[in-house]
Amino acid sequence: MTKGILGRKIGMTQVFAENGDLIPVTVVEAAANVVLQKKTTDTDGYEAIQIGFDDKREKLSNKPEKGHVAKAETAPKRFVKELRGAELDAYEVGQEVKVDIFANGDIVDVTGTSKGKGFQGAIKRHGQSRGPMTHGSRYHRRPGSMGPVDPNRVFKGKLLPGRMGGEQITVQNLEIVKVDAERNLLLIKGNVPGAKKSLVTVKSAVKSK
């Protein structure tokens, strides 16, 4: 069954394995999440648990938000997400979800929002090849064919310059190197999407081998 938790990306560091290998890891701080709601097939048409992370200031919360978390007897949360495929019987409204639901060696998928890069050209944004830079060429870093005579238009899906980054990215099959339950930390092998202090979702892998 699916397990998951919300947290913040703290940054990257490295740890030594028992055999002496140096492992680059991303540190994710996942303070206690709270189960806000259990969704069932009878009432909602599908099964899921709704979890919240990071308390929101009282004056920034509206009445519906305060009423929604009243059953869980907690403060309104800044980040609220649903986890489908979870075992509903294992959770109760108001229950805290901590990092100890995972163990060392677990394989997880991590979802975050990629760093924004601003307005970028087709080469950086889409990985296109550039044209010749010398020998009289006047085609260097442009997008390419943009509407020849016959179709007399630009085709849908043409890779063009534009805003790059700031998209939801999921990196699959990452290994949890260490679970630090005392400090609410997960050390995940490799890098995960997003800037420092950005929100990430860690849940059990859907394609784990």
UniProtKB/Swiss-Prot annotation:
GO terms for molecular function: rRNA binding; structural constituent of ribosome. One of its GO terms (cellular component) is cytosolic large ribosomal subunit. GO terms for biological process: translation. It comes from the Bacteria. The keyword RNA-binding applies. Transmembrane segments: none annotated. Keywords: Ribonucleoprotein, Ribosomal protein, RNA-binding, rRNA-binding. One of the primary rRNA binding proteins, it binds directly near the 3'-end of the 23S rRNA, where it nucleates assembly of the 50S subunit. PANTHER family: 50S RIBOSOMAL PROTEIN L3, LARGE RIBOSOMAL SUBUNIT PROTEIN UL3C. HAMAP family: Ribosomal_uL3_B. This is Large ribosomal subunit protein uL3. It comes from Bacillus pumilus (strain SAFR-032).
